[in-house]
Design a protein with these regions (language model features):
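Active-site mouth of glycoside hydrolases
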Residues: 1-220, 224-230, 234-249, 261
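Carboxylate/His-rich catalytic cores and anion/metal-binding grooves
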Residues: 232, 243-278
């Protein structure tokens, strides 16, 4: 891609009646980058020029601060051998949060040489999403070992440090041999899915709390960067629990999984004209 193609694409969007574009630039900016958190400068320049052309054509932006499973890091998130999962580890690893901050801040607070503005302060930026499809993070299979400490803290607060109350509530779901909070193991995803016992309820309440807290964290960071518009997250899940996680969002964004491009984002790719019902 180059400036000419970026300008032509922006003009084509306007010609076809679009007035807003959603963009998730992390993978593209890290392609060919030299180190974690350091963008490919040619691609960053092209992104800023693209924003300029979109603005010229009256097109607003909805921005995904992060979408890749490895964020603003070197590597290929689509590689099946890639074991990093930032959508999960962002809840427990400060290094992942720092990676999110470094990349997001560069995009939003760097003065665009073509528009002369910081995107965070430009009315062109209409909406922001903290992390695309973050629901995948706390729905991954397996045991959530890294969250065990926060899980125990949550249970201590809920049951007011009275292990007897937890034991009575969990009944036969209390792991064998466990006699106090600090001996509780990490929970497994399957223990909280499609179950109605109190331990399952506690697991889901805990996950909802983590997701709500993450939304608050995203909002604080965006505000600190100078963005004053609507912030949201959890734009994929459609369960009742997901609705609770979005309760304090400024708006609801919801992905619809139909009419995918025939050849991903490559030139000549086509989109079906069928409806979501038709597909």
């Amino acid at each position: 891609s180059n400036h000419e193609e970026a300008a032509a694409f922006a003009a084509k969007l306007r010609q076809n009646g679009y007035n807003m574009l959603r963009i998730s630039p992390d993978r593209d900016l890290m392609h060919g980058a030299k180190a974690d958190g350091e963008f490919n400068e040619k691609r960053l320049d092209l992104l800023f020029y693209y924003f300029y052309e979109l603005k010229k054509n009256g097109i607003y932006i909805e921005f995904d601060a992060m979408a890749s499973g490895i964020g603003y890091s070197i590597g290929d998130s689509w590689n099946p051998r890639e074991k990093r999962n930032f959508k999960y580890s962002i809840y427990s690893d400060d290094k992942v949060k720092k990676n999110w901050l470094i990349g997001t801040k560069k995009i939003l607070t760097t003065v665009n040489p073509y528009t002369g503005t910081k995107l965070a302060e430009d009315p062109q930026l209409a909406l922001v999403i903290g992390y695309n499809e973050l629901e995948f993070g706390l729905s991954k299979p397996g045991t959530y070992t890294e969250l065990r400490g926060e899980w125990i803290k949550f249970l201590k607060r809920k049951y007011r440090n009275d292990f007897k109350k937890l034991s009575e509530a969990w009944k036969d779901k209390l792991p064998e041999g466990v006699e106090d909070f600090d001996a509780l193991p990490a929970f497994n995803r399957d223990e909280g899915i499609n179950k109605l016992d109190q331990r399952a309820r506690d697991i889901n309440e805990f996950i909802t709390k983590l997701e709500r807290d993450m939304l608050k964290w995203f909002k604080r960071q965006f505000r600190a960067m100078g963005f004053e518009g609507p912030v949201t997250n959890f734009n994929m899940g459609k369960s009742m629990r997901n609705i609770l996680s979005r309760k304090n969002a400024d708006y609801v964004a919801m992905n619809n999984y139909h009419a995918h491009p025939s050849n991903f984002i490559d030139m000549g790719s086509r989109i079906s004209q069928k409806s979501s019902v038709g597909e």
